[in-house]
């Protein structure tokens, strides 16, 4: 059973890729986007060092991640309850957002208390990542992205890493 938070994230992600979505602007039915998708996202899976993906050339920019609102529905720098000045300071996640952030893991404060679209579309160090190859249909086995040096989603080879600290979860 999935949480409401995870269902919301999946709904947002699938709205972009749902086949023949009524909001489709341009469609190409004969091709797969699997290769492009694998270039954009990190290596999440049981054996991330044996996977290919997460190319450094296709990462969301910091400017793009700044455009997402806080959980209060306003820009980060306008939210009076959100500490914009400390957004790059490291904070320990103590499980107050179990469906968005890895439990008891440190990440920057900018990744806390953001709107659902941020967690649906953007991957980062310390995020949770629910997808088709999770070990079960429950969040207890959800993937987490850990991209520091020597960690599962850290730099692998000459071009399998993120230059900005962020990945695209779904095109």
Region annotations inferred by a language model:
Residues 1-153:
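An aromatic- and glycine-enriched ligand-binding surface/loop that stacks and positions planar moieties
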Residues 149-171:
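Active-site beta-strand/loop architecture of penicillin-binding DD-peptidases
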């Amino acid at each position: 059973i999935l949480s409401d938070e995870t269902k919301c994230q999946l709904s947002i992600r699938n709205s972009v890729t749902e086949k023949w979505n009524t909001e489709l602007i341009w469609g190409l039915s004969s091709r797969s986007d699997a290769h492009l998708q694998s270039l954009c996202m990190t290596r999440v899976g049981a054996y991330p060092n044996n996977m290919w993906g997460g190319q450094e050339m296709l990462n969301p920019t910091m400017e793009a991640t700044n455009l997402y609102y806080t959980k209060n529905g306003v820009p980060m720098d306008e939210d009076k309850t959100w500490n914009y000045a400390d957004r790059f300071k490291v904070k320990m996640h103590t499980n107050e957002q179990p469906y968005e952030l890895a439990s008891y893991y440190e990440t920057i404060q900018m990744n806390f208390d953001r709107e659902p679209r941020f967690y649906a579309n953007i991957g980062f160090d310390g995020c949770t990542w629910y997808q088709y190859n999770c070990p079960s249909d429950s969040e207890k086995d959800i993937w987490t992205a850990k991209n520091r040096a020597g960690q599962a989603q850290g730099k692998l080879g000459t071009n399998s890493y993120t230059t900005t600290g962020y990945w695209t979860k779904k095109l």
